[in-house]
UniProtKB/Swiss-Prot annotation:
Coiled coil: none annotated. It is found in: Secreted. Keywords: Carbohydrate metabolism, Disulfide bond, Glucose metabolism, Hormone, Secreted. One of its GO terms (biological process) is glucose metabolic process. This is Insulin. InterPro entries: Insulin, Insulin-like, Insulin-like_sf, Insulin_CS, Insulin_family. One of its GO terms (cellular component) is extracellular space. PROSITE patterns: INSULIN. Belongs to the insulin family. Its main location: secreted. Heterodimer of a B chain and an A chain linked by two disulfide bonds.
Length: 50
């Protein structure tokens, strides 16, 4: 999976896709730092799933 910058609604959409029915813990400070300011990949996103 290619790392990419995900910000705002794109980041939320990606979390819905990755986490599905499990849902996710949205901690803007942590995930924006990791995935918006820097590129992140699908494995990084999975860390935020419930």
């Amino acid at each position: 999976a290619a790392a990419q910058h995900l910000c705002g609604s794109h980041l939320v959409d990606a979390l819905y896709l990755v986490c599905g029915e499990k849902g996710f813990f949205y901690n803007p400070k942590g995930i924006v730092e990791q995935c918006c300011h820097k590129p992140c990949n699908i494995f990084d996103l999975q860390n935020y799933c419930n």
